[in-house]
């Protein structure tokens, strides 16, 4: 497993904008990486099986050594428990995709913090301004975005961005007489245009 350095830059900026200390941020990053990677050597601020199977951890378990499939799995990481979770969870997502990119054409006026985190020098005020003046048709690439906001300093990319989506949330509901059933699926389309189900939950029958 190779950590995605661009995603780490974006994560660090979100934490900075949310007034999370550098130490706490480094703990979150290292604990996430240790949970995913296959080795048993903890990083500087990380934790491995010796902690997760030890007496100080209420949930006795081993690190999964795989990527996260749902946001709730992050609750296994000590740095995200308690007040940290309440403070940060709305700004987080989790998909088992190392090259995950955010389609900025889907962002809304309330996503200024996320948008700001994707560029090294983009201020929160400028991010809010851009999203308030974002065309309904979106942009086709970075050059078009930059040309439309030439007075704004973006800096370098500090996250992976896209202008189209390849992850979709499909919700279905069926009813036969008195019986109802529903499902919720996350579907990921790779470059070969084939769809792969990342997760699926059923309710009802």
Regions picked out by a protein language model, each given a short descriptive name:
Residues 1-205:
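Compositionally biased linear targeting/interaction segments
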